């Protein structure tokens, strides 16, 4: 299990083109290095047993129950099942994610049907993905996705931290307290680094999008699913 600290920012056409030029090496940003970009297509389907956000919260349903079909560079389709618990801190997501590959997706769809789950909503994402380093923060790996989601353009950047990084040299209650303090400190530092990162592209981190994808796609302020 790991923590995702993630920021997403809406882009204009010109901003999208600029970020694309940078990750494809047509433009340069001082202090930034990027891996070769991969072309992604993701189709996500979200499931729930309830009809409202209040019901979901009352019954403790995970924030995200998702099936994802994904291709990378037009290669074979891979499918993943994901459960995610989400927290929003200063409009930046801090998520705990559990994910497994699925060799036969039909098994999961039968499970959903027989267990009383229904599809909540879906989204499609066309993206370019790469890993980036800032010279000022060489120990951080920034996973960048430049994306079009249901016809709108976005930049998503995440830092992934492993909980195991905080589990050394302590035990029991002290270990739990130390791990929580370390996690909060790491989250705060990672949020700052994400804001520094998007500034490299002349983007304003105050424009970070606090809404879920469900709210963005449907225009709804209720029944948050992702």
Locations of the language-model features?
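Long, contiguous binding/interaction regions
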Residues: 73-76, 110, 148-159, 163-166, ...
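Charged, well-structured binding/catalytic surfaces in domain cores that contact anionic ligands
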Residues: 129-156
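Intrinsic-disorder/low-complexity detector
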Residues: 170-171, 176-181, 185
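N-terminal strand-loop-strand beta-hairpin
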Residues: 1-139, 164, 203-226
């Amino acid at each position: 299990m790991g923590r995702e600290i993630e920021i997403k920012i809406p882009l204009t056409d010109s901003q999208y083109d600029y970020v694309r030029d940078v990750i494809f090496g047509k433009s340069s940003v001082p202090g930034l290095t990027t891996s070769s970009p991969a072309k992604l297509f993701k189709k996500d389907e979200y499931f729930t047993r309830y009809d409202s956000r209040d019901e979901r919260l009352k019954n403790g349903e995970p924030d995200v129950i998702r099936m994802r079909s994904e291709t990378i560079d037009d290669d074979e389709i891979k499918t993943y099942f994901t459960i995610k618990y989400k927290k929003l801190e200063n409009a930046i997501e801090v998520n705990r994610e559990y994910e497994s590959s699925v060799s036969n997706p039909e098994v999961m769809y039968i499970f959903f049907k027989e267990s009383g789950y229904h599809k909540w909503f879906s989204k499609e994402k066309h993206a370019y993905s790469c890993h980036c380093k800032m010279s000022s923060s060489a120990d951080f790996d920034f996973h960048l996705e430049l994306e079009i989601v249901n016809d709108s353009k976005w930049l998503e950047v995440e830092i992934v931290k492993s909980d195991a990084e905080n589990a050394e040299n302590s035990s029991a209650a002290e270990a739990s307290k130390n791990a929580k303090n370390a996690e909060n400190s790491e989250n705060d530092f990672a949020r700052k680094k994400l804001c520094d990162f998007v500034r490299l592209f002349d983007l304003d981190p105050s424009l970070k999008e606090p809404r879920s994808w469900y709210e963005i796609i449907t225009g709804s302020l209720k029944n948050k699913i992702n």
